[in-house]
């Protein structure tokens, strides 16, 4: 049986054309087998190595496939970008609204500092103001 296989191979080799470029000229560039760009890439090799190691360790059985993880990561990044764009759109409002906001903030600042001054005032001033209110209330009550 082994001899039959050898005979078939010999017949096949006889049918196949032999490359004649070897006999013509030794200066010609001889063709080489092309490399698969996917398998030749470093990232693909690292991914394959990582998958083999995880398979040997038994990891990844319950975890998500890499494609699903990448898709989720992209979706998450898209949501973050979308939120940032919405915030940027809110910031970049028309000039009229920006001016209204500035005026509103100025009015709030003008109203709030007197309250802040009262909070930071020494206690004897607060007591004195309380006494004035009491005395004015009692004088008004007397008038009634």
Swiss-Prot record:
Region (Disordered): 104-123
Keyword Ubl conjugation: no
Compartmental location: Nucleus; Cytoplasm, Cytoskeleton, Stress fiber; Cell junction, Focal adhesion; Cell projection, Ruffle membrane
Reported induction: Up-regulated in the hypothalamic paraventricular nucleus (PVN) and the CA3 region of the hippocampus of the brain in response to postnatal maternal separation or food deprivation and glucocorticoids stimulation in adult animals. Up-regulated in CA1, CA3 and dente gyrus regions of the hippocampus in response to acute social defeat stress or glucocorticoids stimulation.
Coiled-coil zones: 70-90
GO cellular component terms given for this protein: actin cytoskeleton; cytoplasm; focal adhesion; glutamatergic synapse; neuron projection; nucleus; postsynaptic actin cytoskeleton; presynaptic actin cytoskeleton
Pfam families cross-referenced by the UniProt entry: DUF1151
Sorted UniProt keywords: Actin-binding, Cell cycle, Cell junction, Cell membrane, Cell projection, Coiled coil, Cytoplasm, Cytoskeleton, Growth regulation, Membrane, Nucleus, Stress response, Synapse
Compositional bias (Basic and acidic residues): 114-123
Tissues expressing this chain: Expressed in septum, the neocortex, the CA3 region of the hippocampus and the cerebellum (at protein level).
Single Gene Ontology BP annotation: regulation of postsynapse assembly
Keyword check for Cell membrane: yes
Gene Ontology MF term list: actin binding
Motif Nuclear localization signal, residue numbers: 74-84
Main location: nucleus
Function: Stress-inducible actin-binding protein that plays a role in synaptic and cognitive functions by modulating actin filamentous (F-actin) dynamics. Mediates polymerization of globular actin to F-actin. Also binds to, stabilizes and bundles F-actin. Involved in synaptic function by regulating neurite outgrowth in an actin-dependent manner and for the acquisition of hippocampus-dependent cognitive function, such as learning and long-term memory.
UniProt subunit comment: Interacts with ACTB. Interacts with F-actin. Interacts with PRDX1. Interacts with COMMD1; this interaction stabilizes COMMD1 in the nucleus. Interacts with MAP1A.
Protein's recorded name: Actin-associated protein FAM107A
Native source organism of the sequence: Mus musculus
Gene that encodes the chain: Fam107a
